Amino acid sequence: MNGLKSITVTLAVLVFGLVFLSDAGAQGEAQWEKTVAAAKKEGELSIYLNAPAQVRPALTKAFDERFGIKIYVVTGTGPELSAKIVSEYSAGLYQADVSFQGCSTLITLIGTHGYLAPIEPMLILPEVRDGKAWFGGQLNYDKAGTAFRFINHALPPVVYNTDSVKANSIQSFLDLQRPEWKKKILMHDPSILGAGANGISYLATLWGLSKAKDYLSTLLKAQEAAVTRNYQQHVEWVGQGKYAVALWPNPGQAARYVKAGAPIAVTHLKEGAVASPAFGCLGVPAKPAHPNAATVFVNWFLSREGQTLAVKAYELPSARLDVTASGVLKEFVIAPEQKVFIENEEFNAMQDKWIPEWKAVVESVQR
């Protein structure tokens, strides 16, 4: 009799659980349909975008076809777009709905002003809210929950010209101090937030700040390395043979030129790589002009459908585990045995703190 009672109670709990889940699912579906309808009434979406050129048409076309909502895009560098949002908010103008930038740029240049909204309350679709679908088994937010990391890739620190550089001739950062590389290195400017600052800051975590500064000084003074802030030029000039090596390149630009057949290759070094989102971070300003359209876009973009499109457009692997890295260069995909440093918020904070150190080294050479 007790056994029968136990079975009855268990079945009752199970049925209640199923009813609860079914009801929760129905509520979520109703909320989604209501939000989509409201978004269609708004009719448009404004995105501030720092990404490779091919991302813009891919996003606008797919979202318009899927929901009938037009996307208007403002492009620029991370610092430019951040300054624009801060300036607009300071003037009481709320024009941006979504911003795509690097995580450190979003957090440091916009989030610290309180101009980013928490993302989790916007997430409606179960497949997006499910932490198990994402790298690390959890939703990839910063601590404030306002910057969502949707790209996760191994960041190759070197691009080289295959006509003038033999494969495996550069295996360590220290190899670039050899005489044969004098006047042949083009690095991304480490004195601003970006790939260069990310790269030298990683070395500072490995070696300590003093040794990293000495290394940067050696490259700039003894090796007479050139500096650029133009990501396309950085890789293009190596492909054209003006320089043999691009140090700390933009991954999207590197992938584009490799796939186009330029005489370049990317390589990892023995010191390991940073597992980075690059500019693959999404934020929603605190007062979006079209809040429902922003919510629909965020859910769609972070879904399997949206991330499949993102992989094709960015040519970098998604942080979603159920999205394949088809078409992505193997050097950008984190291998199971690969030595990587997972870029995190603490690293981003140190990176920002160290910018004046790198700037001082760069300026000492330019005097």
What residue ranges belong to the model's regions?
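Extracellular/periplasmic bilobal clamshell ligand-binding domains
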Residues: 324-367
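Short, polar/charged alpha-helical segment
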Residues: 29-40, 44-70
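A ligand-binding cleft/hinge motif common to bilobed small-molecule-binding domains
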Residues: 105-109, 244-264
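Bacterial N-terminal signal peptides
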Residues: 9-19
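Extracytoplasmic ligand-binding site segments that recognize negatively charged/polar headgroups
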Residues: 46-60, 72-86, 94-239
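A bilobed periplasmic-binding-protein/Venus flytrap-type ligand-binding module shared by bacterial periplasmic
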Residues: 157-164, 200-204, 277-290, 309-313
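Periplasmic-binding protein-like
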Residues: 183-192, 215-221, 225-228, 232, 260-286, 300-324
